[in-house]
């Protein structure tokens, strides 16, 4: 929020009271989830169509309060063309004492990758450009020591020019319940996260990119498991059962025993699975969909893969400023998280306006 307090107005939408600065007009509900509801709006100050998210009960518990702080800190830090960033954050409150609501403003993104895949089978050039942008965004995110954890087609926004932004970081760790059954939340998950095999690292996101890329090339979900076990079977049928060196790394004894009880399967020849695909695309998939996360390609390495030769530019694949996540290990009271969040709202400086955006 800027130092001079703007004039706010109130309206009720979908049984929720929205209290927003006058610059945001024509609010119309576009969706709601567990963590808030979202309206599309017109920003009269910039001429941009924006998404305004009102967080739901941001400070109702310590977990909520910490999640609210985490989301604001993350969004404030992200400054990259392929990652959703924060255009504005505001509260109608005039002081910390009356601070209870947080509104986040981001670009309004039209379609997501889900809509795109459903509509058409993509050309190889489209796939190159889309996956290149995901990896370019991931290189930036990973350089700040952040793991997305929940990359899937519905979390990737794409505009008419095929420009892509990564949305919705895995801020809230998914509950077991949300991961159960025939659900997309799980289809793109790396096996080590899905099955709690071990401490995971950033390459969980690379596994997800491999699943997404395979889907763009074929028009079909790669591992549409009906449950955790079915999903693991689909994965192992393609990549083969783990060898002794990987089994040693799985810290969960029950997971080790279960895997050892399965019939040994060799890795399939990816060229026979992705028939007709660009051989370079197949080669990259083989480097992403590796069961052993230590041997999976990184985002930075993948950008330099021959498949992206026409897009790769090492001087235009930036990394992030260091991101201080020491708060993650802190145990604070609700009011302390709330006060930290209030400081972040008040100290927000809007990003410089991009001329191209204003003309579009």
Curated annotation (Swiss-Prot):
Residue positions of the PTM N6-acetyllysine?
Answer: 53, 152
The written remark on domains in the entry is: The TXY motif contains the threonine and tyrosine residues whose phosphorylation activates the MAP kinases.
Positions of post-translational Phosphothreonine modification: 16, 180, 263
| S-S pairs | none
Q: What is this protein called?
A: Mitogen-activated protein kinase 14
Please name the gene that encodes this protein. Answer: MAPK14
Would the keyword Cell membrane turn up in this protein's UniProt record? no
Q: Where is this motif: TXY?
A: 180-182
Q: Which reaction does it catalyse?
A: L-seryl-[protein] + ATP = O-phospho-L-seryl-[protein] + ADP + H(+); L-threonyl-[protein] + ATP = O-phospho-L-threonyl-[protein] + ADP + H(+)
Residues where Phosphoserine is found: 2
Cofactors, names only: Mg(2+)
């Amino acid at each position: 929020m800027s130092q001079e307090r703007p004039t706010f107005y109130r309206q009720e939408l979908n049984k929720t009271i929205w209290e927003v600065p006058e610059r945001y007009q024509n609010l119309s509900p576009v969706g709601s989830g567990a963590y808030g509801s979202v309206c599309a709006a017109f920003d009269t100050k910039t001429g941009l169509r924006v998404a305004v998210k009102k967080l739901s009960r941001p400070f109702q518990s310590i977990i909520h309060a910490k999640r609210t702080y985490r989301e604001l800190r993350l969004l404030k830090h992200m400054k990259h063309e392929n990652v959703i960033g924060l255009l504005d954050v505001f509260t109608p409150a005039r002081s910390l004492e009356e601070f209870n609501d947080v509104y986040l403003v981001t670009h309004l993104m039209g379609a997501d990758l889900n809509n795109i895949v459903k509509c058409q089978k993509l050309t190889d050039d489209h796939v190159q450009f889309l996956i290149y942008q995901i990896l370019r965004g991931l290189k930036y995110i990973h350089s700040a020591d952040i793991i997305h954890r929940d990359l899937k087609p519905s979390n990737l926004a794409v505009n008419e020019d095929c420009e892509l932004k990564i949305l919705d970081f895995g801020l809230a760790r998914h509950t077991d319940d949300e991961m159960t059954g025939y659900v997309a939340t799980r289809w793109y998950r790396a096996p080590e996260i899905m099955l709690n095999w071990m401490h995971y690292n950033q390459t969980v996101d690379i596994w997800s990119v491999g699943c997404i890329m395979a889907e763009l090339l074929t028009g079909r979900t790669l591992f549409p498991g009906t449950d955790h076990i079915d999903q693991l079977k689909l994965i192992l049928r393609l990549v083969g059962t783990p060898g002794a060196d990987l089994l040693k790394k799985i810290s969960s004894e029950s997971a080790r025993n279960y895997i050892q009880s399965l019939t040994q399967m060799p890795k399939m020849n990816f060229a026979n699975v992705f028939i007709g695909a660009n051989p370079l695309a197949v080669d990259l998939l083989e480097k992403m969909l590796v069961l052993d996360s230590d041997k999976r390609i990184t985002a930075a390495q993948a950008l330099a893969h021959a498949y992206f030769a026409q897009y790769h530019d090492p001087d235009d694949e930036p990394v992030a400023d260091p991101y201080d996540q020491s708060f993650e290990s802190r145990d604070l009271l609700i009011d302390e998280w709330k006060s930290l969040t209030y400081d972040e709202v008040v100290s927000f400086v809007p990003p410089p306006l991009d001329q191209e955006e204003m003309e579009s």
